[in-house]
Amino acid sequence: MLDPNLLRNEPDAVAEKLARRGFKLDVDKLRALEERRKVLQVNTENLQAERNSRSKSIGQAKARGEDIEPLRREVNKLGEELDAAKAELEALLAEIRDIALTIPNLPADEVPVGKDENDNVEVSRWGTPREFDFEIRDHVTLGEMHSGLDFAAAVKLTGSRFVVMRGQIARMHRALSQFMLDLHTEQHGYSENYVPYLVNHDTLYGTGQLPKFAGDLFHTRPLEEEADSSNYALIPTAEVPLTNLVRDEIIDEDQLPIKMTAHTPCFRSEAGSYGRDTRGLIRMHQFDKVEMVQIVRPEDSMAALEEMTGHAEKVLQLLGLPYRKIILCTGDMGFGACKTYDLEVWVPAQNTYREISSCSNIWDFQARRMQARCRSKSDKKTRLVHTLNGSGLAVGRTLVAVMENYQQADGRIEVPEVLRPYMNGLEYIG
């Protein structure tokens, strides 16, 4: 959520920055609501002061032996007016907050302006796509050859966009997640976490999934039902529970950065993706991901974004997978991001690069929703932290890339060297 003071005092400047990412801020409506808020605020404060003054007069009149009943009736009437004014003010503040919750983050100045993914800017490439001297098989064909990917069984169990993995393919999928976790915890300084896969609505508001993206989630009960202890949603990413671990916390600045990682399944309805990537593992309702989250001082967040992106890149480099790094344009960034790098891995059967990691600096956008703050050791003042998140990596898409890039002419799949210790020294699948 954006700083309310910024929205009140500099709405035109905010609107100009939001326009860069294709969001139209209704400045006139905000101004009208703000003027109404000021009027109601003053009215409420005046009624409160008047009621306090008249209440005090009751005691004084009583001490003088005067009839206090007229004063008591007046105080009661003022109390009713005050309650009505407070209710009106609270309703208006709720309306303003509801609007604020739908406004995306401001883009950083260095983010390229653009409309969609076609305007993203390539930053660098690593590795050279392999030239095959045989007909390339896609991961679905390879998986079926080795009885490792069974989409028909998943349709029977659940429906489309799910998969059953078996045998050495399932083992490689597990090996990838273990390798990623070990790399991030042993070399990159992250602490491993095991988190719930079901979270409450407060948690989803904290990281920005609610209210705007309710339709992208799997809910245990209809969202319109009153929230209670049994009203949950499945996590779309481990970013949600990991980041919310600091909700309503005040952290000493010398404890920062906090670097966390977790391997979880992720659940997404893919509501806007009908007809896209219907074959294979690229776009699933349920997929595994190793997530990275950092909680940092505000002045450190841009450097932390570069570091985190480098950690995701290291996974691809050690696996020997060609990839490219791009910076997302303003129109393609996620709702809460101020700056995002995507890593796209080479997928031979599609003859193109596909997203495998997204690393974002969220600034104080989530921290303000969560009231996550840090305290200076010198003056004890508190301020909002900055939060960052990144995929390190999406496990299913990494499996796709390994299967296709390491395939052999006879259909076998070479196991990358860094994965062999996790697969009992196995060199080839098949």
Curated annotation (Swiss-Prot):
Protein name in UniProt: Serine--tRNA ligase
GO cellular component: cytoplasm
PANTHER family given in the database record: SERINE--TRNA LIGASE, SERYL-TRNA SYNTHETASE
Species, as recorded: Salmonella arizonae (strain ATCC BAA-731 / CDC346-86 / RSK2980)
EC number: 6.1.1.11
Superkingdom of origin: Bacteria
Oligomer status and interactors: Homodimer. The tRNA molecule binds across the dimer.
Residues engaged in binding ATP: 268-270, 355-358
Subcellular location: Cytoplasm
Catalytic activity: tRNA(Ser) + L-serine + ATP = L-seryl-tRNA(Ser) + AMP + diphosphate + H(+); tRNA(Sec) + L-serine + ATP = L-seryl-tRNA(Sec) + AMP + diphosphate + H(+)
Domain text: Consists of two distinct domains, a catalytic core and a N-terminal extension that is involved in tRNA binding.
Pfam family, one: Seryl_tRNA_N
Protein family membership: Belongs to the class-II aminoacyl-tRNA synthetase family. Type-1 seryl-tRNA synthetase subfamily.
Function: Catalyzes the attachment of serine to tRNA(Ser). Is also able to aminoacylate tRNA(Sec) with serine, to form the misacylated tRNA L-seryl-tRNA(Sec), which will be further converted into selenocysteinyl-tRNA(Sec).
